[in-house]
Amino acid sequence: MTGRARKIISSIIFTAIVFLLWNPAPVRAGESEFEFYYQRIEAVEQINNPKPEGWWDKAKAFVKDVGNKIAGTFEKLSRTYFPGEGEKRWYSEKDKNIAYKLQRTKVKSEAHLLELMGAKDGDLSKLTDGQKALLAVYRHSRSQAVKERMDVSYRSKIAVTLSDTTGFDDAKKYPQVENDFWPCSTGRMIQMSSNFFNYAGSDEDAQATFVHEFSHSCDRTVKEFIKPYGKDGRHSCNELTRSRSAFVEGWAEFNEMLDFPSERSRIQSAIQSVKIEKENGEYTQVDATDPSLTGKNLMNVEGVVANIFYRISSELPDGRKKVFEAFKNTNIYWRTTKMMLRGYAEKNPGDAKALAAILNEETHGKLSDAEIMYYLGKGPGVMEFLAARKAPSADKITVPELTAPINAADQGVTVNDEGTSSGNPFTAGSTR
């Protein structure tokens, strides 16, 4: 093949990719459906020599490593799109020399799940705290609150993998289990782990995490490609990030706020201050009302985005229904908070004035008139609000080097960076 032919083919492929990204398939009619799979770790297997000695052993280890990486890539694809049942191998992300031998079974009912976890008679005292959390997730997936969201998703099916790590939770013996089975969403698949919730009273935390990940699976939005959460790969609800990342996580946190008052209180309290990651990866923290932060800065904080959606949902007439409609109507890859808010304002002009007031309050009056119109358009309700308020004097304020220390109790969440599009420290390539 000539160089010219290669360029032509590359151009065609690139054009096709761009077209698909900018023109996604229309949202399917009907509702999403969950497919639950229960998988249990049966053994941790060594799949390569961790300390090869001599050139021959090193050569064999190298070849084996290449083969394992190829097999691991195919395994990740198959677990997402074709989970299947029976004996499976799950390759470690953190230790290239080990893999997990699993037994995977499609869950038919709650009674079946209890049987798989060793409580066929329904005696929940036989379950570990982590197993009880998996049961709580399964039950919440059947709740009315989750069912009401099913038609928001553009996917026909979402696989949910309940990973039971019982017997392998000792971090000293099995240090990689927590990270290798970290709760996440790859879009088509949601992964939940008993290890992560193996403590008393973890049911609600597990359910909130499931709602968070389900919300990611419903969302087409692609986060920024390069370090969406900064150098450390972590994020928290009050961290200054970037526009699409803030939307992706804000949408997921908003859904948690709807179902769980504890999450609502946590997020609303946290966003009174903002965490800013510096070049060296360290954080500083500043009050949200501090002049060093602009209104647009605050719109790139996921918890602020979440609370705006929550207030619209809870304070405006039929707000929840309208928020979900705005989400469905703007579900494209490059969506931002601006797109969804504008879409809401255009479809619901009678709410525009109240919406502008919420936006103004959640950004502490820092958005200029031009910025309010940037997010909401120039409808009569928006213009009426702007005429009645006193706009801030400056449109742009630079963020200086900050020095306030970060509270050690709020260090964010590590992103599991194994996934595709969804963005959460719990979505592959995403976060919670």
Model regions: which residues?
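Fold-level signature of zinc-dependent metallopeptidase catalytic domains
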Residues: 30-50, 70, 74-133, 139, ...
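Sec/Tat signal peptide C-region and signal peptidase I cleavage site
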Residues: 24-29
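Active-site recognition of the HExxH zinc-binding catalytic motif
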Residues: 208-224, 249-253, 257
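Bacterial N-terminal signal peptides
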Residues: 12-21
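Auxiliary, metal-adjacent structural segments of Zn-dependent hydrolase domains
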Residues: 123-192, 199, 203
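Low-complexity, intrinsically disordered, cysteine-poor segments enriched in small/polar
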Residues: 54-76
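Bacterial N-terminal signal peptides that target proteins for export
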Residues: 2-12
